[in-house]
């Protein structure tokens, strides 16, 4: 197989009949590369593409995409559809020649951490999961009506009331703890996060024996003041996890 060149391709793929839009950051290398799928939050203003750039610089491919009903992707937005869209993204990644199919990770931010945990925990092809300011226990957060209306205004086919009702109906990843058995999980939390503060994670971290929690004392929910730190923390952890897996397989 020839050498892979670094680049960025526009991407479309289908999930439940909806055409989803995204981009594929391609890393250079002589062999298929480890690959991450990056899942944005709600409504997805922060795309966390600095993590994608750093991953590519370190020899990783990275797919980012927009869930149905937001940022140009077709369909009506629904929280229940996040997991289906994530599965479709994973299937797209696994068809790419430049992807090492034994080294796939999911990185979810805020609400995007929910499908990362749900899908990553159930799919043995996913070898590691990262949650940044992650949604772990939906029913432990009371979605403010004003916030729901603001977010719904940026999405297609959903109202603020719909968002709040769908939020309460989301399953908890902690209810399927056994499925996560061999998959290392990193949760990155911010002490100044007004949405999911570190106390929000306490019970879940205690239940998940294979989870590592890293806290930043200075940042908010979006890590606005600590982007370089966040990108390095996530990529260093992924590099260590996959390096350890490679050592065990030799």
Predicted ranges, named:
Residues 219-230:
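Catalytic histidine-centered segment of alpha/beta-hydrolase-like enzymes
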Residues 180-181, 187-189:
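Short beta-strand/loop motif that positions the catalytic acidic residue
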Residues 1-30:
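N-terminal cap/lid segment of alpha/beta-hydrolase-fold proteins
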Residues 33, 40-44:
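Active-site glycine-rich loops that stabilize anionic/oxyanionic intermediates
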Residues 43, 70-101:
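Catalytic nucleophile-loop/oxyanion-hole region of alpha/beta-hydrolase
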Residues 194-200:
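Conserved alpha/beta-hydrolase "acid-adjacent" motif
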Residues 118-163, 183:
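Hydrolase active-site cap/lid region
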Residues 52-74:
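Conserved alpha/beta-hydrolase
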């Amino acid at each position: 197989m020839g050498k892979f060149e670094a680049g960025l391709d526009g991407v479309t793929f289908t999930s439940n009949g909806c055409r989803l839009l995204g981009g594929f950051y391609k890393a250079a290398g002589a062999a298929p590369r480890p690959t991450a799928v990056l899942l944005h939050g709600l409504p997805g203003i922060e795309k966390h593409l600095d993590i994608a750039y750093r991953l590519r610089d370190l020899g990783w491919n990275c797919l980012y995409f927009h869930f149905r009903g937001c940022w140009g992707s077709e369909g009506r937005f629904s929280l229940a559809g996040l997991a289906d869209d994530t599965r479709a993204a994973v299937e797209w990644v696994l068809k790419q020649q430049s992807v090492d199919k034994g080294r796939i990770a999911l990185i979810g931010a805020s609400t995007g951490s929910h499908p990362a945990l749900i899908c990553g925990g159930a799919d043995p092809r996913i070898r590691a999961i990262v949650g940044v300011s992650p949604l772990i226990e939906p029913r432990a957060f009371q979605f403010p009506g004003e916030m729901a209306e603001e977010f719904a205004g940026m999405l297609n086919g959903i109202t603020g009331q719909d968002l709040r009702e769908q939020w309460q109906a989301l399953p908890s990843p902690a209810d399927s703890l056994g499925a996560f058995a061999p998959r290392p999980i990193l949760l990155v939390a911010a002490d100044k996060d007004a949405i999911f503060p570190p106390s929000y994670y306490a019970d879940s971290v205690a239940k998940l024996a294979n989870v590592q929690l890293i806290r930043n004392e200075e940042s908010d929910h979006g890590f606005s003041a600590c982007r370089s730190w966040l990108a390095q923390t996530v990529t260093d952890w992924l590099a260590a996890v996959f390096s350890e897996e490679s050592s065990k397989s030799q």
